[in-house]
Amino acid sequence: MTQVVLGEHEGIDSALRRFKRQVSKAGILADVKYHRHFETPLERRKRKAVAARRKRRF
């Protein structure tokens, strides 16, 4: 779970920016996107193969 504790003189904008960065690094939104609909085993294999190709390229 992502939490952001505000400092004494910290503004909402900077706290929101930190929160968005932490959510992005944790991969929470990507996880929500994948779990929005049921993913069949074939789709899962395809997604993992594409990710492996992308990882191998870099």
Curated annotation (Swiss-Prot):
Gene Ontology biological process terms, A to Z: translation
Cystines in this chain: none
Q: In this entry, which stretches build a coiled coil? A: none
Q: Which NCBIfam families match?
A: S21p (TIGR00030)
Q: What keywords is this UniProt entry annotated with?
A: Ribonucleoprotein, Ribosomal protein
**Presence of keyword Transmembrane:** no
A molecular function (GO) term: structural constituent of ribosome
Q: Name one Pfam family in it.
A: Ribosomal_S21
Q: Which family does this protein fall into?
A: Belongs to the bacterial ribosomal protein bS21 family.
Q: Which Gene3D superfamilies match?
A: Ribosomal protein S8
Q: Which GO terms describe its cellular component?
A: ribonucleoprotein complex; ribosome
- Is the keyword Ribonucleoprotein assigned to this protein? yes
Supply the name of the protein. Answer: Small ribosomal subunit protein bS21B
Q: Which domain of life is it from?
A: Bacteria
